[in-house]
Amino acid sequence: MAPSSPRPALPALLVLLGALFPGPGNAQTSVSPPKVILPRGGSVQVTCSTSCDQPDLLGIETPLPKKELLLGGNNWKVYELSNVQEDSQPMCYSNCPDGQSTAKTFLTVYWTPERVELAPLPSWQPVGKDLTLRCQVEGGAPRANLTVVLLRGEKELKREPAVGEPAEVTTTVLVERDHHGANFSCRTELDLRPQGLQLFENTSAPHQLQTFVLPATPPQLVSPRVLEVDTQGTVVCSLDGLFPVLEAQVHLALGDQRLNPTVTYGNDSFSAKASVSVTAEDEGTQRLTCAVILGNQSRETLQTVTIYSFPAPNVILTKPEVSEGTEVTVKCEAHPRAKVTLNGVPAQPVGPRVQLLLKATPEDNGRSFSCSATLEVAGQLIHKNQTRELRVLYGPRLDERDCPGNWTWPENSQQTPMCQASGNPLPELKCLKDGTFPLPVGESVTVTRDLEGTYLCRARSTQGEVTRKVTVNVLSPRYEIVIITVVAAAVIMGTAGLSTYLYNRQRKIRKYRLQQAQKGTPMKPNTQATPP
């Protein structure tokens, strides 16, 4: 603000009056200073003077509060005008013998605007759209010296004189990505430098702009189309081309169940991954929603997920353990809408139940009965399986395959007698010679003469018992030489006899043919002559 005008010194004022009014003549009234610029509510001293020496009347006419100062002379007076709120034109007047006259001083009041306000910006502004900035200014004078400036940061966007009350200045800006986070403001400039004062500035509160880019394409949602009760599934929602991506909000929900995703951000993309658990209360068709909110816009993708309950099929045996020859019923039951097969045989008619009847045999022991159920859910085939095993109790068995009846081993050789009984439960097996000497079944032994003989093998279980005789022959070394010699001699004699027979036979055939040729009797083809 400019300081108040200084009070003129009395000697200087007198000199001035003497210079202005050097002698008598027509009466003239003067005012000093003729022009004043002062802050609103300020005070100013105004001097009124006249050219006559003895005026009948000298004063000032003004609506402003005034006070005559003591200093003064016959033809001049000094007044203090206070609380100047607006432009004013106080008028000095004088009444002299030779006439009346007046003079005005022009008071110009300056003050900065009472309100400089930038209209609120949208909370979010899409990139590529026009943004209108609007600034309103109330008050401020003199208006001829008042300018309104719109700014982005420190960059001027528009400058206009303040016109009207309130003054309003607008401009349009095409929003860009790099405008995100920029501050916009409005500033007034009251320039009184030409009047010897200064530049007065008032700036509005800044408004920060938030820009965004949200593509028109909906987010991509990947999830299972069907989900079984009491299981978990994974849902992934993603979208590319967002700005600023960290400001994007992602909402994932299955029906009324809000999911809690883990969000991973890229440069301009995100991926939200969440686990979803379903219970029997959720069974049926549910809506899966992925919504992305950025700025004042949103994009949404919907999918349907079918929640189903499908327990594994139930395989029922009359008894899991039966004796040989017992009638057994095997049943397979599943979900009412499922189709079942039992050991590959489908139900007739096709449905959720199938059964099989059989008479238990030893071959059925350990047999698995597999029930497969298939349920169609939302166009997908769901498969479940269940297997049960049948145990058949049957008596002991000893046969040639598992327990050979005759063994012939060389003396002093290492041998392992093998005899295994079958049955369920597994029978106890003992092989004894003369009721006391055991055969070391399954053990590696050195064959001696004591091992030779006939053993009675007895297999016993809760299902009965069975016996089988087993003979062990032990060959001593001398018997082996005799046997080898006899066998070799037999081979030699047999070979010699066969050679003699073949030689004599060929000789007789040639002799017969010669006799027939001498008699002139042709030989009959394909007829073999009988030897003499």
UniProtKB/Swiss-Prot annotation:
Keyword Transmembrane helix: yes
Cytoplasmic side: 504-532
Cystine pairs: C48-C92, C52-C96, C135-C186, C237-C290, C332-C371, C403-C419, C419-C457, C431-C457
Segments on the Extracellular side according to the record's topology features: 28-480
Keywords: Cell adhesion, Disulfide bond, Glycoprotein, Immunoglobulin domain, Membrane, Phosphoprotein, Repeat, Signal, Transmembrane, Transmembrane helix, Ubl conjugation
Signal peptide: 1-27
Membrane topology: Single-pass type I membrane protein
Regions that span the bilayer: 481-503
Post-translational modification: Monoubiquitinated, which is promoted by MARCH9 and leads to endocytosis.
Chain positions carrying an annotated carbohydrate: N145, N183, N202, N267, N296, N385, N406
GO CC, any one term: plasma membrane
The keyword Signal is assigned to this record: yes
Gene Ontology terms: biological process: cell adhesion; cell-cell adhesion
Sites bearing Phosphothreonine, chain numbering: T521, T530
Motif (Cell attachment site): 152-154
Subcellular compartments: Membrane
Family: Belongs to the immunoglobulin superfamily. ICAM family.
Protein name: Intercellular adhesion molecule 1
Taxonomic lineage: Eukaryota, Metazoa, Chordata, Craniata, Vertebrata
